[in-house]
């Protein structure tokens, strides 16, 4: 069940780090030490079908029946409290999705609910999306609280450029001095209320990966902007973040890739997609699944803004 307390916290629990989280949202099953039982084999077949249905929905390439099946499996998982499914479904509601004749309409309210629940369960990639959603809705207070929460949990802790700096730059000017103090109080209240659960989830995500789980090489990808005279520079002059769902083979190469969300919606993500397609992960020759799924965030950042703290 969706926690009803979030309905009453729209100012604090808003409707909006990155770093080493690419492997944190992986849903690949662990490799068994012995031959699988018939029930385990059937479970793997069902999971592979579910993954294929969800990928069809996210990529927008599939029949209406397949895409609806992908949506229903995401919805069931999200309502059961699966944070990865909540993150994915919330991201899809951000802008809606068309897949064959299946249309998932944009729904800011559902996006905020699912993403907020994913965030408080340690899926920090939900925080930039929630902040961007609140920017779109004209809710500068809420957007800033999500940006501060993102900054608080960012990895490494010293990351004061990129997404949080950009979000704060774009919204702080909309607030009065009193409101600036209020967002700090609200962010602290959010952290105090949910920190134990978030830290526990982050600790679990940091545990040694299983044999089948993709392990990224290095931090998340950042791409320099084009030259200042380019129209793309104007469109994405602050920052762009694209979250991909990627299927890696046993050798660690990308076999399938689909965009979960792009914030802000960048008009030409070709360069970011190339970066994602070239990304390799750890090989797993002994893995009993042909494809290993993972979220991969790719950030475009021109380092235009940096957060400085004045005593």
PLM features per residue range, with description:
Residues 27-68, 72:
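N-terminal leader/linker segments that initiate helical-solenoid repeat arrays
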Residues 63-72, 100-113, 139-146:
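Structural signature of tandem alpha-helical TPR/SEL1-like repeats
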Residues 31, 43, 48, 76, ...:
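Charge-biased low-complexity segments
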Residues 83-86, 124-126:
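Helix-start (N-cap) detector for alpha-helical repeat units in TPR-like alpha-solenoids
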